[in-house]
Amino acid sequence: MRPSNALITPEGYPFIAYSAGLFLFLAGGAVLLKSVALAVPAAVTLLLVLFVISFFRNPERMPPADTALLVAPADGTVVYVGPATQEHLGACQKISIFMSVFNVHVNRAPISGTVVDRFYKQGKFYDARHADASCENEQCGLVMEQDNGVRVAFVQIAGLIARRILCYAEVGDRLERGQRYGMIRFGSRVDVYLPEGLESLVTVGQTTVAGETALVRLG
């Protein structure tokens, strides 16, 4: 497991370095040459630097005290709540969360337990807000089992802009609820598959906070 507790994820360091270097080059040229033509792109590049820093932010999160609550694995907006079929769980419930480029993109474990399966599927890069993204897009998923035997699957899905899924958890790893386990660059979706019969605590259109927003109560 590689996830860091740093305020900025290490995955963002190269992007920050490149954009900051470009800004310094343009800003330095604008000052030395007294060039408005360089000052304008320098200002635009500074905005890019700030955006990149914001995208790779990695804030601390505090899961709810009630350990029976399954929490959101991603920041974003709920785009689907309803029945589904998942190859590892069979008939189940699904809650889908869409992450825009302005959301925190660090993903967190929704429950405490052991990773019992990991799967990857190559695919398309459709808009992650669309239902077809769950089946057609590139994705990486984990199946976790709680100590009481309850299993939950959650799947990182690439989107129209997001083209890189990072998942550091492996089969056999023990994850705690709210623990960082990966991220997706740059705008994407996470689907959570749950046992049937659970009452959803969120609705379509609701905003979620990874590691804090309760999606359902397990048991």
From Swiss-Prot:
Membrane topology term: Peripheral membrane protein
Function recorded in the entry: Catalyzes the formation of phosphatidylethanolamine (PtdEtn) from phosphatidylserine (PtdSer).
UniProt keyword annotation of Lyase present: yes
GO BP annotation list: phosphatidylethanolamine biosynthetic process
Record's comment on post-translational modification: Is synthesized initially as an inactive proenzyme. Formation of the active enzyme involves a self-maturation process in which the active site pyruvoyl group is generated from an internal serine residue via an autocatalytic post-translational modification. Two non-identical subunits are generated from the proenzyme in this reaction, and the pyruvate is formed at the N-terminus of the alpha chain, which is derived from the carboxyl end of the proenzyme.
Lineage of producing organism: Bacteria, Pseudomonadati, Thermodesulfobacteriota, Desulfuromonadia, Geobacterales
Keyword Membrane: yes
GO cellular component, as recorded: plasma membrane
Family as reported in the entry's similarity comment: Belongs to the phosphatidylserine decarboxylase family. PSD-A subfamily.
Localisation: Cell membrane
Active site: 188
HAMAP family in alphabetical order: PS_decarb_PSD_A
Protein name: Phosphatidylserine decarboxylase proenzyme
Subunit structure: Heterodimer of a large membrane-associated beta subunit and a small pyruvoyl-containing alpha subunit.
Site (Cleavage (non-hydrolytic)): 187-188
Catalytic activity: a 1,2-diacyl-sn-glycero-3-phospho-L-serine + H(+) = a 1,2-diacyl-sn-glycero-3-phosphoethanolamine + CO2
GO molecular function terms listed in the Swiss-Prot or TrEMBL record: phosphatidylserine decarboxylase activity
One Pfam short name: PS_Dcarbxylase
Pyruvic acid (Ser) modified-residue sites: 188
Cofactor note: Binds 1 pyruvoyl group covalently per subunit.
InterPro entries according to UniProt: PS_Dcarbxylase (IPR003817), PSD-A (IPR033175)
Pathway listed: Phospholipid metabolism; phosphatidylethanolamine biosynthesis; phosphatidylethanolamine from CDP-diacylglycerol: step 2/2
Cofactor(s), names only, from the UniProt record: pyruvate
Organism: Trichlorobacter lovleyi (strain ATCC BAA-1151 / DSM 17278 / SZ)
